[in-house]
A protein has these predicted regions:
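Short, linear, compositionally biased motifs with a strong N-terminal bias
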Residues: 10-11
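Core segments of small alpha/beta cavity-forming domains
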Residues: 20-72
Length: 152
């Protein structure tokens, strides 16, 4: 009985850890939960942070680093990168679902009461990990396009 209970607990714990790191929807939700103030920290900085390396693709992080070299000359992106909004106060709640095999559609309620829908374009690494490769906002350029243009 003790072995069976231990096995069930181990499966639950390891399953939760596996889901948070490898399933795209859970990764987006976990990252959104960290964006509670609407600013860049703790997720974003002028150089890729540990959280960026965990949740975003290497190519995204390279584009971010190249673009941010110009951030002192002009503001590369002066909004919350996860929402594309200025002064939203961060993400209060999020619902997300797979829209396509590599796309997570997220609807977010911000702390200012507004709602925002964005899509996270995901890539699957050879090691089996999922990473965000772009954030697509309605009615404006995607984050990756902004970064690529600024990094030239």
């Amino acid at each position: 009985m003790r072995k069976a209970l231990s096995l069930v607990i181990l499966t639950m714990v390891s399953g939760s850890a596996f889901a948070a790191d490898s399933v795209p929807v859970e990764s987006v939700k976990a990252l959104a939960a960290l964006d509670n103030n609407g600013g860049w920290p703790p997720i974003f900085d002028n150089t890729p942070t540990p959280l960026m390396r965990r949740y975003f693709s290497p190519a995204f992080n390279q584009a971010w680093a190249a673009a941010m070299k110009h951030n002192k000359d002009f503001p590369v992106f002066d909004a919350d990168p996860l929402t594309g909004e200025q002064n939203g106060g961060g993400i209060k709640s999020v619902s997300a679902e797979m829209e396509a095999p590599n796309r997570v559609a997220a609807k977010m309620t911000l702390h200012d009461g507004s709602e925002r829908s964005v899509e996270f374009l995901m890539i699957h690494s050879a090691a089996g990990e999922w990473f965000i490769n772009d954030i697509i906002y309605p009615h404006q350029k995607s984050l990756r396009v902004v970064l690529d243009e600024a990094g030239r």
